[in-house]
């Protein structure tokens, strides 16, 4: 049976209540959902009426993922977010009154003008709300995005530098790890109650199958990964003609289940290379030892026995580290020794900023 069903890819709460009922009804009718299936509906507070909420609950939704991003009024106006912090907080308190509904919010760090007290207050508000989970993500400023255009034209402050974003991430770790009501699920996900399981996000990063439905959706099956057609008109036309609306498909690499397991283990950390490799009868501990030693030296990992535990710096770099670990193992298995496991110089971020921040982390830990 299907363990997690996720409605995302944008703002599903923008749908009318009648459409929400239709799509949830179709899913429950046609998909073999587990009795305890996590059914997540993604969206935002703006326009999410009581009628839409009832449609979600009637359709079996047991988890809401709300993109709050920030509670700061100035930052929200700058990002063209319509609802006031007071309204958002009030609505989240109302949503939190539903006993069998996990309410999870996303916070972003790195917005222009968000550093210091602004981010500290965002974390404090989130920690005290009657919700079930919080995700803390770094803001990505894409080259052709409206935000980047505004920054380049001087209409708003620059986004946080990498070093500043890393410090903001570290502050979120300190806030929630020291709070008695919260416990950690992954590097970026925190739970306050047992209602928050975060199943979809954890399963999707590992070797589990993930069936994608809808324009632009991506997933994988038996190691084959693919994406649905991204242009809505073309996707709709292909569906009407009975064609599979596949935009691109990739065949599985050698040892793909091992690679997926390794990546998800590094991302969720701590991890045991001997145990991971043993589950697949492949020795990955010895070939990856130089990589791990370099990361320990860089202040990204700590080792105790067979267990590698990411430091706060390693937790911040987890996506890059997971990617580089699988790339390193792939090249080692294929006898390609050209790989250099340096998560700083090979990342998309500024090497100087990253090195400067890692030095400050090392000093703090000393």
Task: Mark where each language-model region is.
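Charged, E/D/K/R/S-rich low-complexity terminal regions of large eukaryotic assembly subunits
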Residues: 217-366
């Amino acid at each position: 049976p299907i363990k997690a069903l996720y409605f995302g890819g944008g703002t599903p709460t923008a749908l009318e209540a009648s459409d929400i009922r239709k799509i949830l009804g179709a899913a429950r009718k046609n998909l073999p959902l587990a009795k305890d299936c996590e059914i997540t509906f993604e969206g935002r507070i703006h326009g999410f009426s009581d009628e839409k909420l009832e449609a979600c609950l009637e359709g079996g939704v047991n988890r809401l993922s709300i993109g709050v991003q920030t509670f700061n009024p100035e930052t929200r106006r700058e990002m063209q977010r319509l609802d006031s912090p007071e309204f958002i907080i009030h609505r989240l308190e109302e949503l939190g009154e539903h006993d069998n509904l996990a309410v999870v919010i996303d916070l972003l760090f790195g917005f222009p003008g968000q550093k210091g007290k602004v981010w500290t207050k965002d974390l404090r508000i989130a920690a005290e709300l009657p919700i079930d989970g919080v995700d803390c993500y770094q803001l990505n400023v894409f080259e052709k995005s409206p935000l980047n255009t505004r920054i380049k034209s001087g209409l708003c402050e620059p986004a946080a530098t990498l070093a500043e974003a890393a410090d903001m991430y570290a502050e979120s770790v300190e806030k929630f790890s020291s709070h008695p009501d919260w416990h950690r699920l992954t590097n970026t996900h925190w739970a306050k109650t047992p209602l928050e399981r975060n199943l979809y996000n954890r399963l999707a990063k590992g070797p589990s199958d993930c069936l994608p439905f809808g324009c632009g959706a991506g997933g994988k099956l038996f190691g084959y990964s693919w994406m649905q057609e991204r242009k809505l008109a073309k996707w709709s036309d292909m569906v009407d003609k009975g064609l599979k609306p596949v935009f691109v498909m990739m065949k599985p690499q050698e040892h793909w289940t091992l690679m997926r397991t390794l990546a998800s283990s590094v991302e969720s950390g701590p991890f045991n290379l001997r145990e991971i490799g043993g589950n697949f009868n492949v020795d990955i501990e010895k070939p990856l030892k130089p990589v791990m030693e370099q990361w320990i030296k860089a202040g990204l990992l700590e080792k105790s026995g067979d267990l590698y535990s990411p430091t706060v710096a390693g937790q911040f770099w987890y996506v890059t580290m997971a990617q580089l670990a699988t790339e390193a193992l792939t090249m080692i298995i294929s006898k390609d020794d050209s790989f250099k496991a340096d998560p700083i110089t090979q990342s998309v971020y500024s090497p100087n900023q990253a090195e400067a921040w890692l030095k400050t982390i090392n000093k703090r830990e000393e």
